Amino acid sequence: MRTSSKRLHRFNPGHEAAVGIGQANYTPDAASRRMADDLETLPLWYADSGDSVWITHTEGADQFLDSLPLFLRPDVRLLAADALCRLSADVEGPLLATPWGLSPDVLAAFERLRRRGAPILVPAWSDALRTLTHRQTAARCLERVLRRLPELQPIAVPRFCASVGEVVDYVTTCQAPFILKTPFSCSGRGILTLENASITDPERRWIEGALRRWGVVSIEPKLDKTADFALEFHSDGHGCVTYAGLSVFDTHPRGAFTGARLGDPNRLRGQLSDILRGPLFDRLRTAVTDTLCDTVGRIYSGFLGVDMLVYRRLDGSAAVHPFIELNLRYTMGLVAVELSRRVVHPDAIGRLLIARCPAPGDALRAHQADSRRFPARFADGRLRAGYLSLVPVTPASLFRAFIEVV
């Protein structure tokens, strides 16, 4: 997928809040910590051959790898901190610290590991990365993409409000419904929907709390969404941004990721609206690539995704929002792209699913039931049909990541 350096991956979901706080000793919220624990082996499926994954819980990891067919088993090592500290730099060469998302806290964790003797190269944190992660960057990118694609329907660029009064002014002069977002958030977090121009007391308290913590909130009209999709990219940090693939995905009503489609890229493109099956798709890809080259190409090095959507206009016609969100990190969409390329049979279609269970034990029971109900079938070294877990599932697990292929 990328460069000559071997990498040490680490799964740290929800890193945007850590970027916003900007502290090396930041502690993620409980849900992010639990997801990081339960899905920590997920980088197996997008890491390159010879890479390693830094895991905390070794119990079950080796058994999970042993349970995979040899032809499907990634050539990637799962290593705990003690094992990493025993590696020899002379033999191994330094491993480049590569978290799911760059943030001061995860880089500080890598640095502590390096000081214990692990042969790791830790990139430096830059305040410029914080600026790029702020939603204002996505808003500026939206403006640039719209200028490059005049054939798109006009889209309201998010407005950033520093007071409740500014929010009230916006909702009383524009047409409801609206979406408010905190500046450092993703995947349905930090989002409030206003169904009308009359702000309720709970909504006002949410806005006041967000303003106290972040200083601003963004607001924009809520569109009548009919489909989510994303374009995935890689930036080399020297001004070159390249297209990495298409992701078609599903979300909860509040925007949280639930699953992504798997299969041949041309077949996935065929699932999009008719307006994206012609030349507009290629023009959109080019416009976004050029915008990213100008905006992030010389500052950020790594994978990134741009969330987009198809929506229904008042006259019933379909239109495209070309730049909902900028994700400066690995994404579930990129995981889906790699699973389609490496794991799923080219003649099959399926879904990557992320599920959260209410209590310990529920995830294991669901995993066992799915394994019995949809046994995996393989052809030509690929998953042709059935269920495949992407991570170990233990009695303590709450989160699952898995594939269902038909």
Give the role of each language-model region.
Residues 158, 177-203, 230, 253-272:
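Glycine-rich phosphate-binding loop of ATP-grasp-fold ATP-dependent ligases
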Residues 214, 243, 255-318, 356-383:
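A long amphipathic alpha-helix within ATP-dependent nucleotide-binding catalytic cores
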Residues 32-42, 54-169:
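Conserved N-proximal alpha/beta basic substrate-recognition cap immediately N-terminal to
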Residues 2-52:
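N-terminal-proximal low-complexity accessory segments that begin disordered
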Residues 203-258, 309-323:
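Phosphate-binding site of ATP-dependent enzymes
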Residues 252, 323-337:
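Glycine-rich phosphate/pyrophosphate-binding beta-alpha loops
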Residues 171-193, 212-225, 325:
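ATP-grasp fold ATP-binding core
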Residues 345-406:
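Peripheral (often C-terminal) accessory segments that flank ATP-dependent C-N-forming ligase machineries
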